[in-house]
């Protein structure tokens, strides 16, 4: 069988200079456009530092960023023209990403090169040089914490939106202004062997999977300042309007460092179903497996399978906060707000009717083969096994736990839960405080062993 030869389009042949000074946006886009016009091809980025604004990859194009090559985001807001997109659960106008794949199919973005977002400008714009100022401080003082992320509009590094048959492989992502990799409204996407690091800024999520189907994430190493890997499905009234779930998601064989762990939510409006998470190493993350939502999100999260997690120095191995971060989660126009407000403020503040439609449902979750260890004098030593709070009217239910060993500082708490089964679950604690239980029905508790005396004891109502 004769293999069809893949035509190559080297960006330096179109005028790109890898000197870290010359703006190469137009040259890179010309190479991509030429490959697309030829019916497809490989756009190659040789070694060098290529300063660029937003580029748009087209169907049947492979963008190959070679070893020693850096695509470096130019620090210029005008270089990222606004596009209609979903971001953080809302459809609105937002700066385009550095690399955009929108409405395309058969695209590969690969190589051993680096995508550098030069995010410090955007981080400082958001929260100042000391993380206490910037737009965040100004907005929070006015009761607008919920709006600041949506007004700052920091670019993502890679956006795959409304696409099918896309692969992202081998690259290193650093210093993202906002999320690193966003997979939205897409299907048949593979993300593998990425390294995501040097993301000290706010909301620098590693990989976000948003209202997408048949997505595989594997063999990635992620260190960031928010959720390492997150599955989302829209926010509040706008997310319920769109009503697109994330379904058939596989996350496996990844190593996660600093960050929020593996998260479902808080954008849950379209529903999240059939998610398989396995063979994950978590080292020093804030959370291990995390569920979060809010009273206006809605959606059903079900058929979730989690197995073979190994956590070291993780503060909250299991954090299920379904009324998460109210100052961010609930959009409310301030009293006395006069004059014109941004259109996306109105979208965010639109109430959910009837109100009970906004209460999410979490059910049918299996968690097995988990170990939690660590240095109890570590910075994350105030660890607790369970951080769980759902809703009195809609408890988190039908959770099956098996073959789990945790060594933590405290037992923690479980509020508003129903039908939890535990098989071979043992928790070793430093503090003798019992597991606090509130409004639980038919909920098994682990075997607890206090490290001070080695005796087993079980949780009590409190």
Q: Where does each model-flagged region fall?
A:
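Extracellular/periplasmic carbohydrate-active domains that bind, remodel
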Residues: 1-462
């Amino acid at each position: 069988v004769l293999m069809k030869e893949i035509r190559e389009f080297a960006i330096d042949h179109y005028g790109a200079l890898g000197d870290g000074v010359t703006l190469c946006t137009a040259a890179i886009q010309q190479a991509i456009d030429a490959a697309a016009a030829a019916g497809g091809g490989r756009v190659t980025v040789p070694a060098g530092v290529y300063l660029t604004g937003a580029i748009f990859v087209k169907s049947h194009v492979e963008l190959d960023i070679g070893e020693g090559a850096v695509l470096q985001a130019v620090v210029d807001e005008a270089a990222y023209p606004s596009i209609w997109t979903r971001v953080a659960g809302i459809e609105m106008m937002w700066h385009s990403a550095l690399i955009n794949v929108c409405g395309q199919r058969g695209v590969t973005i690969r190589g051993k090169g680096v995508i550098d977002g030069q995010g410090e400008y955007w981080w400082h714009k958001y929260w100042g040089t000391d993380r206490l100022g910037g737009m965040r401080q100004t907005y929070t003082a006015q009761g607008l914490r919920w709006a600041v992320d949506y007004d700052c509009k920091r670019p993502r590094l890679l956006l795959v939106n409304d696409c099918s048959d896309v692969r992202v492989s081998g690259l290193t992502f650093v210093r993202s202004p906002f999320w690193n990799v966003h997979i939205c409204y897409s299907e048949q996407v593979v993300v593998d062997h990425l390294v995501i690091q040097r993301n000290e800024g706010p909301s620098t999520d590693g990989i976000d999977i948003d209202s997408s189907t048949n997505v595989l994430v594997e063999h990635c190493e992620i260190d960031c300042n928010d959720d390492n890997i997150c599955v989302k499905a829209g926010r509040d009234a706008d997310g319920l309007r769109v009503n697109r779930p994330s379904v058939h998601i596989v996350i496996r064989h990844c190593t996660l460092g600093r960050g929020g762990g593996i998260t479902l939510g808080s954008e849950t409006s379209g529903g999240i179903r059939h998610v398989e998470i396995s063979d994950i190493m978590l080292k020093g993350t804030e959370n291990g497996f995390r569920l979060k939502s809010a009273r206006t999100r809605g959606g059903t999260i079900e058929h979730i399978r989690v197995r073979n997690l190994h956590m070291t120095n993780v503060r909250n191995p299991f954090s299920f906060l379904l009324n998460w971060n109210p100052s961010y989660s609930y959009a409310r126009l301030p009293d006395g707000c006069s004059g014109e407000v941004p259109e996306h403020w109105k979208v965010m503040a639109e109430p959910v009717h009837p109100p009970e439609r906004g209460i999410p449902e979490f059910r049918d979750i299996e968690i097995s083969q988990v170990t939690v260890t660590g240095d109890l004098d570590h910075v994350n030593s105030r660890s607790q096994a369970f951080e769980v709070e759902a809703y009195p009217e809609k408890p988190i239910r039908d959770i099956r736990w098996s073959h789990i060993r945790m060594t933590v500082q405290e037992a923690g708490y479980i509020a508003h839960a129903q039908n939890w089964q535990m098989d071979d679950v043992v928790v070793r604690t430093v503090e003798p405080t019992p597991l606090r239980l509130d409004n639980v029905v038919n909920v098994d508790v682990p075997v607890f062993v206090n490290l001070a005396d080695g005796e087993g004891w079980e949780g009590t109502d409190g």
